[in-house]
Amino acid sequence: RLYHDNVLSKEPGCGRTPWHYDAHHFPLRTNNVVTAWIPAQPIILEMGPLAFATPISTYKLVESISFDKFSVSYDDAISECFKKNNVDIVNKPFDLGEISFHHNLSCHTAGRNNTNVSRVVLANTFYEDGTYIVENPTMVSGDWKKFFPGLEAGQLAKTDLNPICWERGKNVRYFY
């Protein structure tokens, strides 16, 4: 199902996106969540492309760090942890047509936009059909009620805004 689709514009001079993984942000009782990050133009390093800590299990190094939406302490603690543990960071430009798919446990960041051009990206997030909203969404979950109008915590995450985008087990056709 579609959780949301966002156009993300990082304006010229806009600062970096702090380290995080999306499981904090989506109030879903599943880890079967993926985001497609689709650049609308080539993104050079100076524009602040998406960067990842690898491997995906890196989140285990930082899952005990308390998330703080209002300060840089969380970001600083993750950065320090990654340095201490020699975590590999993949930070590369995106050519037009390249898409990043990342799991909700993938630790990621994005650099500052040091150009005079807006960095524009479409980010679509999908989750497994049959998923429930967590019992206690947090402030970090943001405007989750906008994405699930009429639903309350603990209910099945299914509204007209969350269509099934593809069905499990159905034949999928790949076009090259």
Model-derived features: positions:
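Conserved double-stranded beta-helix
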Residues: 1-50
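Non-heme Fe(II)/2-oxoglutarate
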Residues: 65-67, 99-101, 105-176
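Double-stranded beta-helix
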Residues: 43-109
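Short, function-defining helix-loop hinge/capping sites that tune catalysis or transport
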Residues: 28-30, 62, 111-113
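Short, surface-exposed loop/helix-turn segments at secondary-structure junctions
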Residues: 21, 73-87, 118, 137-143
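Short, solvent-exposed aromatic-acidic interface loops
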Residues: 8, 55-58, 142-145
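A short beta-loop-beta micro-motif enriched in histidine and acidic residues
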Residues: 22-33, 87-88, 94-96, 117-118
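Feature marks short, surface-exposed loop/turn motifs that line or immediately flank catalytic pockets
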Residues: 11, 44, 59, 128-130
